């Protein structure tokens, strides 16, 4: 693979309850190569999982400067990255995403979810399977608002 080849990154995030157990699913494609990633947390939100799907996909790439086409059904992610929506929450993940996007030539595309797109459907299945696993870890960046900052 060369940096001139386009990498297609399909993502989805899901949560059972919002907040609740959540998962992300990723499908990466480049030429004949394909890779799938997934993971989940015991208590999180769908938006955090949508963001984490993009982050985990970008973190898995080894070619600095590669052209990456991100396809997500999350208007939250796509419009924040392309239309400058205000970032009120999830600052930890936005910082990670910005840092990763700076390493690649990334373009974001919105794609209608649950509309029969094979890669999006696969990402959704991976996300749901991930949050259905027992003994999910804590999402350390998720703040339930129950704890107060002391300083």
List where the protein language model places each region.
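A short acidic-Thr-Gly-centered motif at the start of a beta-strand
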Residues: 1-4
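Short amphipathic alpha-helical face segments that pack within enzyme cores
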Residues: 48, 52-56
